[in-house]
Design a protein with these regions (language model features):
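Low-complexity, intrinsically disordered regions enriched in charged/polar residues
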Residues: 14, 28-32, 75, 79-83, ...
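Mature extracytoplasmic domains of secretory-pathway proteins
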Residues: 49-117
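Generic detection of short hydrophobic beta-strand segments and adjacent strand-loop junctions
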Residues: 119-121
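Proteolytic cleavage junctions
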Residues: 124-149
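Long, low-hydrophobicity ectodomains and other hydrophilic envelope-associated domains
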Residues: 1-69
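Generic hydrophobic segment detector
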Residues: 1-9, 14-17, 84-88, 124-127, ...
Length: 149
């Protein structure tokens, strides 16, 4: 089941829909063994392949393993929820840079949009429920900065 935070409830009033993409990460499990996720609902893509490739800048400033890297981060969706982007960025950082394993669990992610607005993510804590349904037009992402500590 999908729990819809905030104004997402007003977007989805019907019992069933077609053409939706649901990014499901188990958030809760109730006493009847039903799995729940929060947010993560968008319309299906109209196109296939890479839609957006904002620059992903990653830096670790302290220690002997300090580094700065920048490269395109490929997004294959026209719209992506903050929940899915957060999950995929963390997965990328775990696989490529040992986040939560070999380097500190501390760090921040800043997702900057072309209109000047941005989202900040704290790598020490889980994305808050109220932001999980936030939808971003992937072509509007200017860049993504990751600062590992």
């Amino acid at each position: 089941q999908v729990l819809l935070p905030g104004n997402d409830k007003s977007k989805f009033q019907q019992r069933s829909y077609e053409g939706l993409d649901v990014f499901f990460v188990q958030e809760k499990r109730d006493k009847h063994d039903i799995f729940y996720t929060v947010g993560g609902v968008i319309q299906n893509n109209k196109t296939s392949g890479v839609v957006s490739a904002p620059i992903l800048n990653i830096s670790k400033e302290k220690g002997e393993d300090a580094f700065v890297k920048g490269y395109p981060y490929y997004i294959k969706k026209e719209k992506i929820t903050l929940k899915e982007l957060d999950y995929k960025l963390r997965k990328h950082l775990i696989e490529k840079y040992g986040l939560y394993k070999t380097i500190s669990k501390d760090g921040r992610v800043k997702i900057s949009l072309k209109d000047g607005s941005f989202y900040n993510l704290d790598l020490r804590s889980k994305l808050k429920f109220k932001y999980m349904g936030e939808v971003i037009e992937s072509k509007q992402i200017k860049d993504i900065e990751v600062n590992l500590k």
